[in-house]
Amino acid sequence: MRHGDISSSPDTVGVAVVNYKMPRLHTKEQVLENCRNIAKVIGGVKQGLPGLDLIIFPEYSTHGIMYDRQEMFDTAASVPGEETAIFAEACKKNKVWGVFSLTGEKHEQAKKNPYNTLILVNDKGEIVQKYRKILPWCPIECWYPGDKTYVVDGPKGLKVSLIICDDGNYPEIWRDCAMRGAELIVRCQGYMYPAKEQQIAIVKAMAWANQCYVAVANATGFDGVYSYFGHSSIIGFDGHTLGECGEEENGLQYAQLSVQQIRDARKYDQSQNQLFKLLHRGYSGVFASGDGDKGVAECPFEFYKTWVNDPKKAQENVEKFTRPSVGVAACPVGDLPTK
């Protein structure tokens, strides 16, 4: 893991995260013009950072937040579509990979709300991963939720997963990506104040807990409703920050992520190898007791057993110590039911 140079190497993936200024857009043509601006940014960053392999833009960087419901539907994208074609051409032209936001992506059933989607485009202009946000930021966001994570071979073979903003507040999604083999988890977010310190902290903790690289791209600026705090960052698999932006609009950070180092750590580290130890629980004591050398593999967590085997029961259980309705009468949001 290296930070401070503009290069990359056969073993290192050059990654840039962009503090993109949150746009406020209303029409399809405005969205497409913004896509063309993002394409220009890619060309400029590649010129300044010749080692660049992967560039990452924040959630909402393409469409902005459509606070008007009809505008949200009118500007929703198809994948592939006009927006993705612009991004694909920019990646191909500049020989880089890119992560781009689509808020939203049209639902297969036209009357249902769109998805909040990320795409990973390779240096040939091909879409190699499409991820739909599993955990939209309720009660404000009204995206239709996605239902799974993905892992693909990224630049130089580094295994990449995509997650979005509020997803990252749930340890389960990080662990799911990591346990499926992800070595770099990309978190694109449009996160606003007041949650700045919590969001800076959680990505470092999740990198450490899951022995994975983390790249965060966050929005900056004020869109008339929210103020976005930036702090796009790149975190090493040991939880240390390699590079972090401030609140500056359109700032960026860059680091080189070693493919070999993370694989070496996952293979040879012992006391802090959380991924291995979770599925080989207590192996030292089990071995010393003469019960084999693999530890205990069974899941000891009652909540997860219930969730998998009886989701409705798990839902009822959490409502017993939280609340039975999605809305809250003391602070209503829209027309969400409060009883």
UniProtKB/Swiss-Prot annotation:
Keyword terms: Hydrolase
Domain CN hydrolase positions: 13-259
Enzyme category, top tier: hydrolase
Reactions the enzyme catalyzes: a monocarboxylic acid amide + H2O = a monocarboxylate + NH4(+)
Domain of life: Bacteria
Molecular function in Gene Ontology: amidase activity
Keyword flag Hydrolase: yes
Pfam family, one: CN_hydrolase
Active-site feature positions: E59, K133, C165
Entry EC number(s): 3.5.1.4
CDD domains (UniProt xref): aliphatic_amidase
PANTHER family: ALIPHATIC AMIDASE, NITRILASE C965.09-RELATED
Family membership: Belongs to the carbon-nitrogen hydrolase superfamily. Aliphatic amidase family.
Purpose of the protein: Catalyzes the hydrolysis of short-chain aliphatic amides to their corresponding organic acids with release of ammonia. Also exhibits in vitro acyl transferase activity, transferring the acyl moiety of short-chain amides to hydroxylamine to form hydroxamates.
UniProt protein name: Aliphatic amidase
Species: Helicobacter pylori (strain P12)
Gene of this entry: amiE
